[in-house]
Amino acid sequence: MKKTALIIFLGCAALINCMAAAPLAEADKTSKASLPESRPEAAVDQLIPWLLDESRQLRGIRFAEVIFDTTGKRVLPVNPKSEVDRRVVKAITTACDETVKKLNAPASAIQSTTRINEVSSHFEDALRELLNAEPGLSCDLPRTAQGRVMRSGYPDLRIIALASKRVFYLDPKLYAVGSRDSSFRTFYFEPKIATNKVREDAVHFIAGFEHKPREKSGRWNFTRWDLVDLAQFKVKLKAEFQGSNRDIYRPEAIVATSAK
């Protein structure tokens, strides 16, 4: 049932995108008719009931299913019997230890950073540098289907074991002490064709780094980390309808404004 709900949602979302891109003339045509009569089976009308029923249908979905249904690629579990997997896990372990040590240093770049969101890129850069220095491994920013490098969006890093060509995706996450069991959203994946960065069957990892509250002196202190295999990771859908300022403040929609 969850699989069906996910497929219906993805299909409806794709159809809505197509409808949004339709010619304006067609939009003008439909606006002349009443909404129920002009599009009784419109994708949005099919989508809304699924969103309202998300507590039953769209929770506890395996991330591996989401990846496969949106990209056609498989999320591979770590194989503890594989020499390649053991070697990569060991390399990531060493890189995580060295990254924490490096960035906790008083002179590190993060110690002059005020917002924790701005610290994340330093972890990505440090891990990438350390993993690239590991013989037999390559680590870089994953590219989209068009070959573009994007820092935003999942995943952050792509590791490849050069001899076997086995791919590992690594996504560093930072969280505060005491928030480990929080139910607030800390992970998201947005299915898009143009900006998709998952392009191979791969092992998917999250490296979670825990930090203390920023000290009065301004110092950041990271205390521990965990490497998580996402093969059995489950997610839920939180759908929202969005609009920009350009969408809101259209001249024809403004009915009053302040005096000049």
Model-flagged regions — what are they?
Residues 197-259:
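Domain-level recognition of nuclease-like catalytic cores that cleave nucleotide substrates
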Residues 17-27:
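Bacterial Sec-dependent signal peptides at the C-terminal "C-region" and cleavage site
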Residues 1-8:
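Bacterial N-terminal signal peptides that target proteins for export
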Residues 175-211:
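Short, charged, amphipathic alpha-helix that recurs within catalytic cores of restriction-modification
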Residues 8-17:
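Bacterial N-terminal signal peptides
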Residues 28-126:
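Interdomain/boundary linker segments immediately adjacent to catalytic/signaling cores
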Residues 157-159, 168-176:
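Conserved catalytic cores of phosphodiester-cleaving nucleases, focusing on short active-site segments
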Residues 124, 128-160, 164:
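A short acidic/basic microdomain associated with nuclease active sites
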